[in-house]
Design a protein with these regions (language model features):
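Juxtamembrane intracellular "pre-TM" segments in multi-pass secondary transporters
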Residues: 1-25, 212
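Pair of pore-lining "gating" transmembrane helices in MFS-fold secondary transporters
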Residues: 17-37, 120-121
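Short amphipathic helix-loop junctions that connect adjacent transmembrane helices
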Residues: 40-55
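Small-residue hotspots at the loop-to-helix junctions and early N-terminal turns
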Residues: 53-61, 150
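Helix-to-loop junctions at the C-terminal end of transmembrane segments
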Residues: 70-85
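Intrinsic disorder in cytosolic terminal tails and internal cytosolic loops
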Residues: 84, 196-212
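C-terminal transmembrane helical hairpin of 12-TM major facilitator-type secondary transporters
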Residues: 85-133
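A late C-terminal transmembrane helix in Major Facilitator Superfamily
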Residues: 135-176, 181-182
Length: 212
C-alpha cells in the first residue's frame, strides 16, 4: 500500500489538535521527566549524599518494587474505579509527596529511610498515574492509534528526557534540586490535566473522538 502524505498529515493534525491527546501527552512528558530525573540522580543521591555504598542496588530496588506493586494494584482497581479517578487521585498524591519531599530536604531532616519511603510513595503514585494518562490520551485516537502512539510517545520521551537531564544536572550534593524538580513536574502535570479536563477532575471533559 503506497504511503499517502496527506493522510499522514491529517492524522498528525488530529493528534496535535485533540485536547485530550495533547493535554495528557504533555502531562506524561512532565511526569516522565520526573522519572528520568530519578534514574539520572539516583546513584549520586544514594551513594554520594547518603553513602549507601554497595547497598545502592537494594535501595533502588525498593523504589522500583513500589512501582511494580502499584502497577499490579492498578490492574485490579482501574476497571471498577475508572481511569480518571485512579490517575487524578494518584497525581495529586504525587504532588503532595513531592512537596513533602522538598520540605524535608529544605529543613535538613531527610534521612535515608525518609528518602526511600517518600520515593516509594512518589513512584507508586507515578505508576498509577502514567499508565492511565497514556490510555486517556489514546482514548479519542482509536481510528489513528498507530500515528497517535508515535506522536505522543515522541512528545513524552524527548521532552521527558530533556527535563530529566536538567534535573540530573542540577545535583549539588543535596536532594533539594531533585525534590524541587519533582514538585515542579508534578504540579505542572496536575495543572495541565485540570486545564485539559476543564476543571472536571475525576469525571472528565469528553471531547469527540478522531474520525480519521
Amino acid at each position: 500500500m503506497p504511503i499517502d502524505p496527506r493522510s499522514i498529515a491529517r492524522a498528525w493534525r488530529h493528534v496535535l489538535t485533540n485536547r485530550m491527546s495533547v493535554g495528557y501527552a504533555l502531562a506524561l512528558m512532565l511526569l516522565s521527566g520526573a522519572l528520568f530525573g530519578f534514574i539520572g540522580s539516583a546513584q549520586q543521591i544514594f551513594v554520594e549524599h547518603f553513602g549507601v555504598g554497595n547497598r545502592f542496588g537494594l535501595c533502588f530496588a525498593a523504589v522500583a518494587g513500589a512501582m511494580g506493586l502499584a502497577g499490579y494494584l492498578n490492574s485490579r482497581i482501574v476497571e471498577r474505579v475508572g481511569m480518571r479517578k485512579v490517575s487524578h487521585t494518584a497525581v495529586i498524591i504525587f504532588v503532595a509527596m513531592a512537596v513533602l519531599h522538598l520540605i524535608t530536604a529544605l529543613a535538613g531532616i531527610e534521612t535515608l529511610a525518609v528518602f526511600i519511603l517518600l520515593q516509594m510513595l512518589l513512584m507508586g503514585a507515578f505508576a498509577l498515574t502514567t499508565s492511565n494518562f497514556n490510555a486517556i490520551a489514546m482514548e479519542p485516537m482509536a481510528v489513528i492509534a498507530g500515528t497517535a502512539s508515535s506522536v505522543q510517545g515522541a512528545i513524552t520521551q524527548i521532552g521527558g528526557g530533556l527535563i530529566g537531564a536538567i534535573i540530573g544536572q542540577a545535583y549539588d550534593g543535596t536532594t533539594i534540586p531533585y525534590s524541587l524538580g519533582l514538585a515542579v513536574c508534578g504540579s505542572g502535570a496536575l495543572a495541565i490535566v485540570a486545564i485539559t479536563e476543564r476543571g472536571r477532575l475525576f469525571r472528565g471533559y469528553h471531547q469527540p473522538p478522531a474520525t480519521g
